[in-house]
């Protein structure tokens, strides 16, 4: 879909600028629910549904070693991955229904600084 159909919020524009500082590029035009970011072999998804509520949330690949993430305060790290359609570079499996869906770890960041630390830890 074209970018004008799903314009970025001010917060999302700031998040993409920080991602760019860490070498991440926008892989394709933003869609309704996600911004797909890539650096080298690392792909993350910015959760646009949560950023609309001023929550910074990023989906990481389910094979990501979460122990590598910064131990500093500011990152909310879940116990298990979450299913969500639309993350085309992540694996799929059946959750509660009959159809497989993509899944990943939804990491929440307390602020822009913790978002930057998260991206730095992934590279």
Describe the predicted segments one by one.
Residues 4-26, 115-122:
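Amphipathic alpha-helical segments
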Residues 10, 29-32, 38-41, 110, ...:
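Short, well-structured alpha-helical interface segments that form or flank functional binding sites
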Residues 19, 36-37, 103-105:
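Short low-polarity hydrophobic stretches
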Residues 22-29, 81-85:
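Short linear motifs in intrinsically disordered
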Residues 27-33, 49-52, 96-99:
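Short, ordered beta-strand-loop transition motifs
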Residues 34-91:
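Short, conserved beta-strand/beta-arch hydrophobic-aromatic motifs that form part
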Residues 84-123:
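Well-ordered alpha/beta subsegment
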